[in-house]
Every structure is written in structure tokens, then in C-alpha cells.
Curated annotation (Swiss-Prot):
CDD domains: MnmA_TRMU-like (cd01998). Belongs to the MnmA/TRMU family. It catalyses: S-sulfanyl-L-cysteinyl-[protein] + uridine(34) in tRNA + AH2 + ATP = 2-thiouridine(34) in tRNA + L-cysteinyl-[protein] + A + AMP + diphosphate + H(+). Residues 97-99 are annotated as: Interaction with target base in tRNA. GO terms for biological process: tRNA wobble position uridine thiolation. This is tRNA-specific 2-thiouridylase MnmA.
Amino acid sequence: MIKKNKKVIIAMSGGVDSSVSAWFLKNENYQVEGLFMKNWEEDDEKEYCNAAKDLSDAEEVCKKLNIHLHKVNFSKEYWEKVFENFLNEHKKGKTPNPDILCNKEIKFKIFFNYAIQELQSDYIATGHYAQIKKKNGKYFLLKAVDLNKDQSYFLYTLKGIQLKNILFPIGGLKKSQVRIIAKKIGLKVAEKKDSTGICFIGPKKINNFLNRYIKAEKGDIITTEGTIVGKHNGLFCYTLGQRKGLGIGGIKGNYNIPWYVIEKNIINNTLIIAQGSCNKRLMSIGLIAEKINWINDDKIIFPFSCQAKIRYRQIDIFCNIKYINDFLIKVLFDSPVSSVTPGQSIVFYSSKICLGGGVIQSRLPLL
């Protein structure tokens, strides 16, 4: 099928995935143009942000592939739609996932609309590891072939109506295959490391970054028995299930069993810890989720059973979903689950199909 009249704007990040995606689209006879999004003003964040290097890499790839590269600054929109939420949720003691919100508000809303309306594109494309399939006139989001790299977890806020204008060119490939292709076509980014950490922070320590924006109030670290064993540096620095960086070495207990964060008490500004990753105080029988999105609303009939992930790259867990109201659902796990973290997202699956998801409002503790 000749697609030379179909225009695609691909989000170029300067990485190997978007670069190979652009190459695939060119080979499939699309009219391809790239777009580099500047979502963060890095003038004061040189320690954290790699945007300048990423832009340089994107420019070099586009030059080699002979495609035009648009450069757009969405940093104001990112601050208002993503970063302010990120800070507010941390202040509430939750652990948000800004990359999911970035996909929803920036990549698949602001960028999507800019490409379709301003640049008159037929499609947008990204280097995400996910797949889109059409069946009986409807579009479905599926896991990638490379389950280790599958990014459908980050894409659950999409709607079926959007999917018809979105392309994920490498969703059917393994990451190793993508790198091999990049080498064969002579892309210098073939061996570029995958981005790590939150997009605007990079691999640096998040707590150092957050200290620039949130006033840290130190407080007590206490055991479930009420014993004070140390001081925390601000509740936003910790997440449920965390074991490293607690600074409580040498306290009494079974020295062979590590300590974990099991609760953050905002009212008393205390961090509560217990020993063992399967400690009953860390386990949950379910959760309450908010900000729900179903990719294909008409396919959802309550109650129903499916699989779910409460964090990226987690093995799917079986659960039952019950309707509470138009804004909340109750999720009950088949077996207790450790480290359910308010602020993170739970994403639902029926085998390989991503049904949608929501933000974890609260957990239903085992004890």
C-alpha cells in the first residue's frame, strides 16, 4: 500500500527508538517530518537535564534520514499540566508518575493537536514499545512484542478514538532488533543508553531535585511498635516499599531482614517502617483508584475480572474490579500484594489488550 500522501509527524527524542521509528516510516513511504519537544527549561538545571544533547542527536538523525525537524517549546504547558501536579502530589505524601501525565497532557494532547491541526498531519508517531490493532472498526492498545520493554503501562490514558491517528512503528520489534537496525543504517545513536529516571530529572537523585521546590520538614522514623529509630528528611523523599536510603543502620531487630517503609503519616509527619518485604503491614488486599480512563468505554461492564500492573514491568496480577461511582473503582486482588503506592497508576489488561487504568487513591491494607 502506497502511503506517500499520508503525512506523519514523529516525536524525535534523540534516542534510538524514535530514530529507528522514523526510518521505518520513511521506508513505508509516509511523508515524514520530525518534531523535537522542549518540555523543560534547562537553564538552571544543567545538572539534571540532557535536552541540549538530545536535540543535537535528533538533528543529526533527521539530517541523515533527510527529514525536516520541527522544534517546539512546550515547557510552559509542561509546567502547568505536569510539573505542578507532580509537586502537589509529593506534598500530599503520594508518589506520582509524571511520565504518564506527560503522555496524556503533552505528547498525546498538545503535541497531537499541534501535529494534526497546525502541521496538517494525518498521524503522529512515537518510539513507544506498544501496538495498535484494529478490529471490527475499533482500535485497541496492545502490549509490545518485547514484554521487557513494553510501555503500554504509560499509555493507558489514551482513548480508542485517538489510536486511529497514532503509529508505534517499533512495537512489533525486540529492543535488540531496534539497535541492530540502527547500526546497519549507520545511526550514531545505535548504542545510546536508554533514558532513565523522570524525564525532566534524568538519572540524578530525585530528592536533591525536589528540595529545590518543596520545603523539607524533618520528622521521626518509627517502627510499628512506636519506637523512634531515626529522622527522615521530609516525607516526599520516601515511597511505600522503599528499603534503601532510610539511614537507620544498626537499629535493633533481625539484622538479616531489611526494613521497609510501610506508611507515611502526613498529620504527624512520621515515617513508619517494618521488617520484611512481605510484612503483613506492607500487604494490601486491594485498592481504590481514581481518575479512571477506559480506552474503549463500551467494552467495560462491571464487575469484571482481569489482570493488572501496579508498577512498570511488574508481572501481571489477577484482580476483580467493582464500580463505586463515576469517579472511583474498587480493585480486589486474588492474592495480597506488596507495596501498593498511592499516586502511582494501576493499569488493567485482558491478556495483551490494555483496557485502561487509573491513579491509586488509597490502598486496602491486609491488616
